[in-house]
Regions:
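N-terminal alpha-helical scaffold/docking segments in eukaryotic complex subunits
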Residues: 1-37, 41, 45
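Alpha-helix N-cap/helix-start positions at coil->helix boundaries
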Residues: 2, 18, 33-34, 49, ...
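Core register positions within helices of long alpha-helical scaffolds
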Residues: 11-15, 42, 74, 106, ...
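Amphipathic alpha-helical scaffolding segments comprising HEAT/armadillo-like alpha-solenoid repeats
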Residues: 15-29, 48-61, 80-92, 112-124, ...
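Register position in tetratricopeptide repeats
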Residues: 45, 77, 109, 140-143
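Helix-adjacent hinge/juxtasegments
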Residues: 63-81
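Solenoidal tandem-repeat scaffolds enriched in leucines and small polar residues
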Residues: 126-137
Length: 159
């Protein structure tokens, strides 16, 4: 498996250099969760806002918590409000606290008031890590609201 994965990574690098979005969309359902994790991150990098829908589907449907976590992280890093619905759903209902935590952080990074209701509800999550992530994310929303600033600083400190 490791050798096959390395060979695939070599091909992935070539496809990355060619910015082949469809290639990485297809890898989002690959049997190897390591490949899916990489595909999520690379698709976010090369596709921008076009990556929101397929990465949101990974966040909702992938059976591996690490892959879903990376999907949440990538949606936050992309920073588009079109990713909020998928992230909010993950905060509310993902079975993994690891994913709920990252989705809450990602909502803070996006920095939109549209996420406030979800983050307020996350303050009552059963997991202390999710609750703490919601506090940090809400602090960023408060800062953005009070300063009317949505800068690189707020994106880096949003979660």
């Amino acid at each position: 498996m490791a050798y096959d994965r390395i060979r695939l990574f070599e091909e992935m690098e070539k496809q990355f250099e060619g910015k082949n979005e469809q290639y990485f969309r297809d890898l989002l359902t690959h049997q190897d969760n390591v490949v899916r994790t990489r595909a999520v991150c690379i698709l976010a990098d090369i596709a921008g806002e076009n990556a929101i829908k397929p990465i949101g589907k990974v966040l909702k449907d992938d059976d591996n918590a690490l892959v879903r976590h990376e999907a949440a992280f990538s949606l936050g890093q992309l920073g588009y409000t079109s990713g909020i619905a998928a992230l909010a759903d993950a905060v509310r209902s993902d079975p993994s606290l690891f994913v709920r935590h990252e989705a809450a952080v990602a909502l803070g990074v996006i920095g939109s008031e549209d996420a406030r209701k979800t983050l307020d509800a996350a303050l009552k999550d059963e997991s202390v890590e999710v609750r703490e992530s919601a506090v940090v994310a809400l602090a960023n929303l408060d800062y953005i609201k009070s300063t009317s600033s949505s800068s690189r600083f707020t994106k880096l400190t949003g979660g």
